Amino acid sequence: MNSINVKTLRWSALVLGLGAGMYEHRSHIQCQKQKEIDENYHRQESLIESAKIAYLNTKNTPPKEDSMLPNLKKDSEDFDMDEFVKELEKNV
């Protein structure tokens, strides 16, 4: 009678251990999948933010002045009044 109780106890412990191991394995896999999803989401967020910044930088860059254009700034030493008047006439 004693041996039947010991065998039953051993088999019960084995089944409980296998069940606990399967539960732990499933929760570990689920945690890994969720972590991978979160990392992918944060990576995409950072890519979107860097793309927004790059777009704003390209949109807000001032146009480069052409060196062939006459100097139309009144404060500079190379100011050309004739070119300035011609430019005003074109705009009017």
From Swiss-Prot:
Gene Ontology biological-process annotations: proton motive force-driven mitochondrial ATP synthesis
Claim: Mitochondrion is one of the keywords in the record: yes
Molecular function in Gene Ontology: proton transmembrane transporter activity; structural molecule activity
InterPro entries named in the record: ATP_synth_F0_esu_mt
Membrane topology listed for this record: Peripheral membrane protein
Compartment list: Mitochondrion inner membrane
Top-level taxon in the UniProt lineage: Eukaryota
Segment forming the signal sequence: none
Keywords for the protein's UniProt record, in alphabetical order: ATP synthesis, CF(0), Hydrogen ion transport, Ion transport, Membrane, Mitochondrion, Mitochondrion inner membrane, Transport
GO cellular component entries: matrix side of mitochondrial inner membrane; proton-transporting ATP synthase complex
Homology family: Belongs to the ATPase e subunit family.
Known function: Mitochondrial membrane ATP synthase (F(1)F(0) ATP synthase or Complex V) produces ATP from ADP in the presence of a proton gradient across the membrane which is generated by electron transport complexes of the respiratory chain. F-type ATPases consist of two structural domains, F(1) - containing the extramembraneous catalytic core, and F(0) - containing the membrane proton channel, linked together by a central stalk and a peripheral stalk. During catalysis, ATP synthesis in the catalytic domain of F(1) is coupled via a rotary mechanism of the central stalk subunits to proton translocation.
Quaternary state and interactors: F-type ATPases have 2 components, CF(1) - the catalytic core - and CF(0) - the membrane proton channel.
Protein's recorded name: ATP synthase subunit e, mitochondrial
Organism: Schizosaccharomyces pombe (strain 972 / ATCC 24843)
